[in-house]
Swiss-Prot record:
One of its GO terms (cellular component) is host cell nucleus. Interacts with gE (via C-terminus); this interaction is necessary for the recruitment of VP22 to the Golgi and its packaging into virions. Interacts with gM (via C-terminus). Interacts with VP16; this interaction allows the formation of a tripartite complex composed of VP16, VP22 and UL41/VHS. Interacts with the capsid-binding protein UL16. Interacts with host CGAS. It comes from the Viruses. Residues 94-108 have a biased composition (Basic residues). Its main location: virion. This is Tegument protein VP22. Residues 1-126, 239-284 are annotated as: Disordered. Highly phosphorylated in the host cell. Packaging is selective for underphosphorylated forms. The keyword Transcription regulation does not apply. It comes from Psittacid herpesvirus 1 (isolate Amazon parrot/-/97-0001/1997) (PsHV-1). Coiled coil: none annotated. The gene is UL49. The keyword Phosphoprotein applies. Belongs to the alphaherpesvirinae VP22 tegument protein family. Tegument protein that plays different roles during the time course of infection. Participates in both the accumulation of viral mRNAs and viral protein translation at late time of infection. Modulates the RNase activity of the virion host shutoff protein UL41 probably to ensure necessary levels of key cellular mRNAs and proteins. Plays a role in microtubule reorganization that occurs after viral infection by stabilizing microtubule network.
């Protein structure tokens, strides 16, 4: 039995070898025999002079260069993001601080009839100058609030601080214009030629500003602000722009003040004797 099994196993080996040899013969015959007219071989036909190793090396170079560029760019992005995140955090902190200061200013600015904890505290001329710059850039005019129904009504809630800021800004604009005109006149009078002359002028110069625009304060301040916004020079006419003539504004204002202060009898005596009185002015 053992011999039979060995012989049988040997026969199986022979049959396997013969089958494998037949398959190899078929492959060789298929490769050696010319393909049929419509058949396509399972390999790519490259043009003559084409080097596949060169193509592979280029592709590998591109992949390696692309990976290195991406890694360097990612590092650069990380380096850029880190310093960018720091100022962003600082800016957010500054915004929070500014918001808290603004809220505290608003709370302290509110009051009834000037009853505030600190008159020279958060509400100062510096804040009004900042608001003045904003007003000039936004092309807004100057004037009191129109909230009260009549002139005798008491201001309530935010009307008081609004009118106070409008008044301070209008007076500051008028004083600024007068100061500029006075500084120009002083420069044209002394005409410094060197630093020593300029230092002497600064030490000896004394400018006194008197703001007395009368009821035309809002018009004068608005005209000066529009001139500054439009880049026009500040002239003396802007200080009396509320009336048709500059000199006439001062004289008419003086006459109106004088007529209010003078009694009625003196005003009647100043009239010409030859001029007839109107019927409405006669006393009955």
């Amino acid at each position: 039995m053992s011999y039979y099994t060995n012989e049988q196993s040997g026969g199986e080996k022979k049959t396997r070898k013969s089958s494998s040899s037949k398959r190899s013969d078929r492959k060789d015959s298929a490769s050696s025999s010319p393909p049929p007219p419509g058949a396509v071989r399972g390999r790519v036909m490259y043009p003559p002079g084409y080097d596949g190793d060169a193509w592979l090396s280029r592709r590998e170079r591109r992949e390696s260069s692309g990976s290195s560029d991406s890694s360097s760019s990612s590092r650069d992005d990380d380096d850029r993001r880190q310093p960018e995140q720091q100022p962003k955090a600082q800016s957010t902190r500054e915004r929070r601080k500014s918001q808290t200061t603004v809220t505290t200013r608003r709370k302290t600015d509110r009051g009834d009839g000037g009853k505030s904890s600190n008159s020279n505290g958060p509400w100062s001329i510096d804040n009004q100058c900042a608001n003045l710059v904003k007003r000039l850039s936004l092309a807004k005019g100057f004037g009191p609030s129109a909230t009260p129904a009549s002139d005798s009504d008491r201001w309530r809630t935010t009307t008081n601080p609004a009118n106070r800021s409008a008044f301070v800004q209008a007076v500051s604009v008028t004083a600024m214009a007068q100061g500029e005109l006075a500084a120009r006149a002083a420069w044209e009078k002394y005409k410094p030629r060197n630093n020593e002359d300029l230092e002497k002028l600064v030490e000896t110069l004394e400018i006194k500003i008197t703001v007395n625009p009368g009821r035309g304060l809002w018009d004068v301040a608005s005209n000066i602000a529009s001139a500054i916004r439009n880049g026009q020079p500040i002239t003396h006419d802007l200080l009396y722009a509320s009336s048709p003539a500059g000199d006439g504004a001062r004289t008419s204002r003086r006459q109106s003040c004088r007529s209010k202060s003078m009694p009625r009898g003196d005003e009647e005596d100043e009239r010409d004797a030859g001029s007839p009185r109107p019927p409405s002015s006669r006393r009955r």
